Amino acid sequence: MPVVKGGVWTNIEDEVLRAAVSKYGLNQWARVSSLLARKTPKQCKARWVEWLDPGIRKVEWSREEDEKLLHLAKLMPTQWRTIAPIVGRTATQCLERYQKLLDEAEARENDELGLGGPSGGEAAAPSADDVRRLRPGELDPDPESKPARPDTIDLDEDEKEMLSEARARLANTQGKKAKRKARERQLEESRRLAVLQKRRELKNAGINIKVVTRKKGEMDYNADIPFEKPAAPGFYDTTEEEARNERQREMFDPRKQQLANKRKGDQEEDADRKKRKNDKNGSSAFAAAARAGQMQKIREAEQSSKRRALVLPAPQVSESEMEDIIKMGMAGDRASKMSGDDETTRGLIGNYTSIVGGTPIRTPRAPPEEDHIANEIRNIRALTETQSSLLGGENTPLHEGGSSTGFDGIAPRRQQIVTPNPMATPFRQANGLGATPLHGGIGPGATPLRTPRDQFALNQMEGGQLIGTTPRDIRLHQKAVSQAIRSKLASLPKPKETEWELEELPSESAEPTVAAEISEEDAAERDRREREARERAAQAELKRQTQVYQRGLPRPSVLDIDALMARASQVTDPINGMIAKEAALLIANDAQKFRLPNGKVEGKARKLERLNDELIEAARAAIVAEVASSNQQQEWLQGFDDRWSSTHSNALPGLANYGDDDEDENMYRQEQRMIDAFENVQASLLATAERGNKLEKKLALHYGGYQNRAKTLRTKIVEASSALENSKYELNAFQTLQISEESAISRRLEKLRDDVAFVLKREREAQETYRIRKEELDELVAGTEAVVNGWH
């Protein structure tokens, strides 16, 4: 029964194929397939090319690769074998990625238009993956590009036999055939050297013989040129051909050719082979396993991309120099702070801190660009779904120009975003391009080359002296500077008589208080001092607040400040009125300043005047002193007893607060009427809202399709108007081009006619000259023959 070869690849078959390729190379696929009982040579080659080759990239696709794939698919449709090496993937990977991009675009468009149908369950529409997934009973048409199937625990008999045979054949590197081939190569080389030596000796003896070693139907590649195409007789310019041949000759390396002809498996030493054969212990197996693991690591390292170490130039400023610069800057800041209070010293010290340049610090953002990948996918789907050209109509609108990858070359078009380099373009500053250079050769708005912060113009010409200056120019410049300084000093006003009073200098025995002030304070001490100062300020601010806030007593959550202030102003007693107003003002300020989580405050109170802490303490002391007096305490007790007796004299507490019953009944009825009206209005609002929701759903059901259609038509109208505008621009451009070409055609024709007439004239003159010379030659030949015949 014949065996049908093919099917899913297993891990064992992949490992055997790798080992066979490492031994037999990439050209002897028949030998490689002889180790795999279930695979043909074509399938072995496809498996290596599509999956096992270390050069295959199996990582996720990047955006640049997707853009390049769609661009090449637009240039070379369905030519996946040509596109694959350009993209750096296999043809199967390119095709699968291309189909996946189209499927994702289609699914995204369906989701946007709401055509997905009910979600979930069997009612959902099948996706592209569901359509391409194999069903039970179907065979994978391309198993070479799929991952290997895990090995089973119990192998079949044919699999065990295949594995044992592959192990035996791959381990046999010292077989009879290998020895015979090596011996034949050595004999062939010695025979060739003997023939060359014999020919050299005969040539030295004066006998030249021709070495003919080829058989019938063969070619001697040392003497003949294979595939030679002799050039036609005549005179031709062969400069370009000679240069091309010279480049090809330089590129040819005979050593690589010899290495390609050799087999990859090198013969090992006989001593090592005998040692492995005689070693029956477990150490040989352990060493072989370790060696195999090491070789596997080497292969994996070769398969992975080699990353070179990042080589950076040496820093221009060392760490010590950077520390010196920082110390100099700190010293300058300290001196500026010390001299900041004195007007006289402040004018003599400039600000040498860092200055931010005109160029932006952050990298400029990239300009908004269109999604080239999405536009190319839309173009492909539009070209695929378009109707036949026989039906007529307008062409399919496509994304062209800057919104697509274009047709400029094999690589997609992209806009290069380059970060501006202020060192490469020093004249392109914020004050304008092409400005007039400053005096001294320095660019517009640029800082001097060596002193970027020169406020007193001490090194104004230093940048110009670095380039193109001579000693004479330097002397003239110094002389001009000295004269300018003298003229400025001469223009100063004359000194006035002024009396100065100088303070006495401190004695040497005095304590160095200045040095103590100048010395820096420890950071921990400074932080502790600032924290204590903040705590003292917080305690003082807390003592300035009311006792209600300090003790955390309950406060009103809902407060109407205007009503509270109005009730306080209605108090007739002037003293109690002042107290009531002040209390109302304190309550309002506490409610506004320290709001409760769910509190509600209406109105706005005037801001409290901030009193001095000494006045507050004096007032509190006066209150305590007044309360401490016994007479005041007795009066308070007597007033409390009177108030208690008057309050509890009635039968029911608070009965005096109730008014007339008729008035209360009228107010109750009015309140009930308002509640009923409110409930009726609320019920009407709910019914109206429910009826409106029903009408909205009904209208959406009936007119939803029309709305979508109107939206689509509106979009098409906008696109058609833009296309019409572009067509008008193109028509005007082509009309202008036609007019210019028509005017140029006449001039070109006239010039060509003049050239043809000149060529015809020169040709006639040449023919006439040739005829005259030919007649003279014939006469000379005839005269020579007559003389010769006369002698005979």
From Swiss-Prot:
Span list, region Disordered: 111-189, 224-307, 389-410, 490-536
GO cellular component term of the entry, any: post-mRNA release spliceosomal complex
SUPFAM superfamilies registered for this protein in UniProt: Homeodomain-like (SSF46689)
Domain HTH myb-type: 1-56, 57-106
SMART domains xrefs: SANT (SM00717)
DNA-binding interval(s): 29-52, 80-102
Compositional bias ranges of the Low complexity kind: 507-517
Gene Ontology terms describing biological process: mRNA cis splicing, via spliceosome; mRNA splicing, via spliceosome
UniProt KW keywords: Coiled coil, Cytoplasm, DNA-binding, mRNA processing, mRNA splicing, Nucleus, Repeat, Spliceosome
Highest rank taxon of the organism: Eukaryota
A GO molecular function held by the record: DNA binding
Keyword 4Fe-4S listed: no
Cellular compartment(s): Cytoplasm; Nucleus
InterPro entries cross-referenced by the UniProt entry: CDC5L/Cef1, Cdc5p/Cef1_C, Homeodomain-like_sf, Myb_dom, SANT/Myb, SANT_CDC5L_II
The family this protein is said to belong to: Belongs to the CEF1 family.
Function description: Involved in pre-mRNA splicing and cell cycle control.
Protein's recorded name: Pre-mRNA-splicing factor cef1
Native species: Aspergillus fumigatus (strain ATCC MYA-4609 / CBS 101355 / FGSC A1100 / Af293) (Neosartorya fumigata)
